[in-house]
Curated annotation (Swiss-Prot):
GO molecular function, one term: DNA-directed DNA polymerase activity
Chain spans, region RNA-binding: 299-401
Site feature Cleavage, where: 401-402, 582-583, 1217-1218
Protein name per the record: Transposon TyH3 Gag-Pol polyprotein
Active site residues of this protein: 461
Subunit structure: The capsid protein forms a homotrimer, from which the VLPs are assembled. The protease is a homodimer, whose active site consists of two apposed aspartic acid residues.
Effect on the protein of changing residue 602 to I: In Ty173; reduces transposition frequency 60-fold
PANTHER family for the chain: TRANSPOSASE, PUTATIVE-RELATED, TRANSPOSON TY4-P GAG-POL POLYPROTEIN
Keywords: Aspartyl protease, ATP-binding, Cytoplasm, DNA integration, DNA recombination, DNA-binding, DNA-directed DNA polymerase, Endonuclease, Hydrolase, Magnesium, Metal-binding, Multifunctional enzyme, Nuclease, Nucleotide-binding, Nucleotidyltransferase, Nucleus, Phosphoprotein, Protease, RNA-binding, RNA-directed DNA polymerase, Transferase, Transposable element, Transposition, Viral release from host cell, Virion maturation, Zinc, Zinc-finger
Gene Ontology BP annotations: DNA integration; DNA recombination; proteolysis; transposition; viral translational frameshifting
Amino acid sequence: MESQQLSQHSPNSHGSACASVTSKEVHTNQDPLDVSASKTEECEKASTKANSQQTTTPASSAVPENPHHASPQPASVPPPQNGPYPQQCMMTQNQANPSGWSFYGHPSMIPYTPYQMSPMYFPPGPQSQFPQYPSSVGTPLSTPSPESGNTFTDSSSADSDMTSTKKYVRPPPMLTSPNDFPNWVKTYIKFLQNSNLGGIIPTVNGKPVRQITDDELTFLYNTFQIFAPSQFLPTWVKDILSVDYTDIMKILSKSIEKMQSDTQEANDIVTLANLQYNGSTPADAFETKVTNIIDRLNNNGIHINNKVACQLIMRGLSGEYKFLRYTRHRHLNMTVAELFLDIHAIYEEQQGSRNSKPNYRRNPSDEKNDSRSYTNTTKPKVIARNPQKTNNSKSKTARAHNVSTSNNSPSTDNDSISKSTTEPIQLNNKHDLHLGQKLTESTVNHTNHSDDELPGHLLLDSGASRTLIRSAHHIHSASSNPDINVVDAQKRNIPINAIGDLQFHFQDNTKTSIKVLHTPNIAYDLLSLNELAAVDITACFTKNVLERSDGTVLAPIVKYGDFYWVSKKYLLPSNISVPTINNVHTSESTRKYPYPFIHRMLAHANAQTIRYSLKNNTITYFNESDVDWSSAIDYQCPDCLIGKSTKHRHIKGSRLKYQNSYEPFQYLHTDIFGPVHNLPNSAPSYFISFTDETTKFRWVYPLHDRREDSILDVFTTILAFIKNQFQASVLVIQMDRGSEYTNRTLHKFLEKNGITPCYTTTADSRAHGVAERLNRTLLDDCRTQLQCSGLPNHLWFSAIEFSTIVRNSLASPKSKKSARQHAGLAGLDISTLLPFGQPVIVNDHNPNSKIHPRGIPGYALHPSRNSYGYIIYLPSLKKTVDTTNYVILQGKESRLDQFNYDALTFDEDLNRLTASYHSFIASNEIQESNDLNIESDHDFQSDIELHPEQPRNVLSKAVSPTDSTPPSTHTEDSKRVSKTNIRAPREVDPNISESNILPSKKRSSTPQISNIESTGSGGMHKLNVPLLAPMSQSNTHESSHASKSKDFRHSDSYSENETNHTNVPISSTGGTNNKTVPQISDQETEKRIIHRSPSIDASPPENNSSHNIVPIKTPTTVSEQNTEESIIADLPLPDLPPESPTEFPDPFKELPPINSRQTNSSLGGIGDSNAYTTINSKKRSLEDNETEIKVSRDTWNTKNMRSLEPPRSKKRIHLIAAVKAVKSIKPIRTTLRYDEAITYNKDIKEKEKYIEAYHKEVNQLLKMKTWDTDEYYDRKEIDPKRVINSMFIFNKKRDGTHKARFVARGDIQHPDTYDSGMQSNTVHHYALMTSLSLALDNNYYITQLDISSAYLYADIKEELYIRPPPHLGMNDKLIRLKKSLYGLKQSGANWYETIKSYLIQQCGMEEVRGWSCVFKNSQVTICLFVDDMVLFSKNLNSNKRIIEKLKMQYDTKIINLGESDEEIQYDILGLEIKYQRGKYMKLGMENSLTEKIPKLNVPLNPKGRKLSAPGQPGLYIDQDELEIDEDEYKEKVHEMQKLIGLASYVGYKFRFDLLYYINTLAQHILFPSRQVLDMTYELIQFMWDTRDKQLIWHKNKPTEPDNKLVAISDASYGNQPYYKSQIGNIYLLNGKVIGGKSTKASLTCTSTTEAEIHAISESVPLLNNLSYLIQELNKKPIIKGLLTDSRSTISIIKSTNEEKFRNRFFGTKAMRLRDEVSGNNLYVYYIETKKNIADVMTKPLPIKTFKLLTNKWIH
């Protein structure tokens, strides 16, 4: 039975179509209608409401649509007669009996004609005493009089009922819903009572007081039909009427029984909630009363657990018992029995008879045998409810996860078995077994099920009433063939093999058990939360644990998919042997193929299509009779439900009829689908499909882009294929009006080939239904195949091609043939087909050695189009091959991820299909095939560049048993490697370069040499061979820990390209015991660095210790160490993978090191990442290829740029001007003029909206008294310099509203008309970011306000005049300004002074010194940006008080109050912010960039590729003089200003990772060469590809006592023109990036150390200013830190030696930095170069390094 909570119980829940009815024990002395006074009033109110709508006209009466029904009349007016009988609603006392009315004696034998069966027919009897309806038929029922009452009439005869007849009786209301039937029955019974028929109403024992007469039965039948239409009757009522349509008495009897049951339950609940006990009655009586109530509620499906029961009992205790409420309330595991023991003890003390009464304390063994979930009796007992159950009662069913259980045993045992659905029970029949009993004979079906959705776990289900499991190996004390049925949600029976106990052993070493049913016919193993609750175990989904009521955690819960799971490792296995299996074994020759297997084999087609195909032999090898179709009707494929989910179906039959007259392949439909995002460069982003109108044959072709030449190539291919293969000529091609089809190139091609293009007409979407439906179908199939197989998304077109092959072979239910048959081709041999994603092993014909494994794991995709082979995807080689040398992989290790009917489920069926094809590993194979691993030239995915999700075998091989890593780790790793190598990779890195496609034909046995990365000084380290040293114990531990990082699974790949090899020890995951290099401890290394004299002329080499952060000075106190750890702890630094061991061959030892010279490059120019190249390996380094970002565009520069030093002798006039005028960046114009928006606007709707906005702005100007309307001035009389030109500007906001603004032309305003000393201040972006960060950490409410027409609130002091608005028509007149109009030079300053004064004087705020437009008081912080305000406070009421004060003076509009606890979205100063208070904040600009970037006219997504980094290292800007004319030069400069303007706006808002590229390109705005434009296009393209990226903040730990402000600094020495250095700084508050800066050093530095000192000195002033702001806004202490990767810089800062400063400038700079660090309490620490996220601010980085440094804080 379903567990119900006390507060969720509804007395009207009976009678639903899905629930059975259980008859319950009913007291005969209680009126079933007398539930409660409140319910009676509610019922009558409902009937009044229902009838009040039917009182006015005849059309609103009870049955208005019947032509025989007339409106009721008063008694004095005779009713109209439309036939031989009176109207059914005009029942009078003295109606005459019509002739022929007398029927047979028994009511059930009344002969009804079809007309008489109508609800409108009512033939009264000769002496009928039925009352007449009043004139207001259908009006609400009046309150019953005392004589009619709310009880049944217990008259002894019919005559007594007839004596007190009322003249008028109101009819019952009409039944309008099955759910209202219980309430309607109550009013109907009252209607019968008022009609003197109370004696025929069944009493509580089911029998009426007297026998019903024929007249009364007819009256009962007709009135029931009139007021209870059949369409609104519940299912159980319809079932009774289907047996006997006149058996209204049975319906009334059952309704009364239900009402009585509900009344008893309600009374019990009320009684239990209002218990009172003070010892005045015996404790025995009180205990009996309470336990009886609880037992009744539990038996009726209302489960009262111990905790609730004890709380209700204790709440009613008073007197001397009241102290139990305070002594027991903390006892969480208290039971009802224990509570009553204390009550008995107090009662015995009160009576003074403790020794004379028996002791009520029971033995623990008695409590264990109690049948309830709590113990409150002295002996176990079985509660049997309703011992007098009638024959027509049904047992209550209990629901599980889509299943429910009911009992089929005799009625005497029914209750005990039903009770077991929610709690442990005491069984009574011979099959009952207690826990611990031995099993003598059993037929439990032990079935191994290891293919759950989440293997090895149980599905937690709150709706399940019973626990069901498929494997019998965990069932204890099992008994076979129990008399219990399992019913799913569709009421289908599922057989149960056995019942037993499921025993748990949890983390706290506690054991418990619940009842479990065994069946192999369910999708998942279900664990009922109701049964766990019965043993005091609950599921906490906030903490994801199973716990007891006292909070003890028992086991974790796993969230997988949409469900929650708990591991089976907590189950105790049974020690019984596997019993006899009940299933009948079917021989191999007669067993049929299961339908789910065929469904998946044939691309998840529907059953009807597959049957048609088998009948018509379009699918060969087996017949329709070979498939088991029993489950086809009810089978639901989860992959189809997920992959093919749709909104609605396309409209069929929408094509024109004339198309049917064409011959095959003369009329084609075509359409393009795409793009598909986040794919590797080699994978297509689009596909184009063709469908023949006559044969319905389909073709699909992949596309990387939608350019004209790409589309033309496909058209050429398809036309040639049809002409040569089918000897047909295409006459017409139907397509939509996309630009890829309407371009001139394709039009000329079709015209040249004599093909008519048929375009869809405007708004005729139905005409293109063939191509659109095909694309939708193929896309559904693609999603389903990928979902089912678990293959990565970049193989999506392989799924499309597989589906096309199958779809062409399936018969159409309409034509009874397949497309292949229509085309004259043979049917598809299904034995040549494999399920998409089937695991296989491919033969490796060219291994490294004879002992190398010959098999490569792969996944079958689709049959080859160019050979007899199969296209197979090989994750380890990152490619697809076309081969016939493969074998199907079977067994557990080949299992895919998603569902339990994947390849493993049908291994035997698959073997039967492919039996005729021998594997290359078969024992009888003699000759080896010659077509080994034929690479498919046709396939676009023949070569896939991927990072497969599988660790390499070299890791497990490198670990020796003597390593310090625990042995368990080796075992787990080896298992994981073997298992992962045969699993489909779930995800793939979409940003892998296209150049690394083919692996080498012969894998080299020589490993690659890791590249050497430059140090902070830009110099290179020489390689001392051998490099490897044995790991110390600490290093081994750290490597082992790092190897477990989930973010970096390819540690060997990273170390080959990103590791710095020096002469210091290198930690290795492999634990190589190389004894040729002496071991150097971390302490000794650190000691050498500390005591070494700092070198000024040349930077010291970087230490590459395995420590993440190494302090440069020896800590003197523990507090300083804690400070360092505290500063570093929350920073979003990358997690470095462990460095793998690298072995170098002997020939390499003889090679001299390769040195790379420095170059002067605008974008880095230092080829340090390629200092060492791969030796003896033809395979190119993936990291080298990732840095070669190539974007295909006809006008883009395709020349291979090399790192060459540019000549310095050439003059660069434009470049010099650009450097001096970097700030001349023009914003993008997004507004319209008056003539563009209104005068010449051809869009009528938009024009009307702009006109409306125009008038709204004019009215606002007049309302604010912007100008003097009393006098107009002549233009000739006013000094021209005091006349300000004005204009209207219009724009459309992102929310869709149209805005108009009247502005002054301040750009041409005369200087004498304003005070140049006034400042128009706005909030600094760093102040806003700081306030947002503090708001997140302190759970502040954020409120956003807007002050309408803010400038107009500020008066203007100067005498200025403007022209009137255009609509006034006074072009020769002037008006004098009184308010600060938008656009004036002084308007901003005037408004700032106005609002500042009001906030300080009226709102009690004060402005933070040094930070303009930041106001604060003790509760609220305000950031002001012109007319936008952002309020921050701990208490939302504080914000509201400020708002109220602002509204008193200004028109203040609340944009976002910020009161919700869920995620709130803001648009603050261009930043799109998602904020959930106390959890996270995300800052981005996706919507803004999506709108603005396309308006720049930059070609986006050329060739469908996505950039992985904004630039590439190793290039410099060729700065030759420009040879272009003046007009073209201005046009390009203007274009650069727009592009760099947008990039700067975005970069300084939140995309700090782009600042280096923005700063570098901004220096070349006035030098718009083709290369500069190409690099700018590349930057905009990257911004477009990553427009969805966000700056991610998470709330700081609440335990942090201090605010931590950190600046991370970096410098690239001499990498800018004229050997200038690039410096960069990133600022973080409590681990959140709040700002960044990248700029070229103002002076030329002579060393790396000097550049680093310059970078740090640039960061200190802003760091101090931010520190002051933070202390003003938040009173917590603040810790300031500086992080740099230059040890020599730190040494100079810490040292007191001034002798080695090379010059005065360098010395003064260093000394000043020393003073700033010491005077401002700054902590300076060292950070590894690989972890220095400020590195992205100073130079272009390889893709992998760029991602590594940024993916922690922006993604």
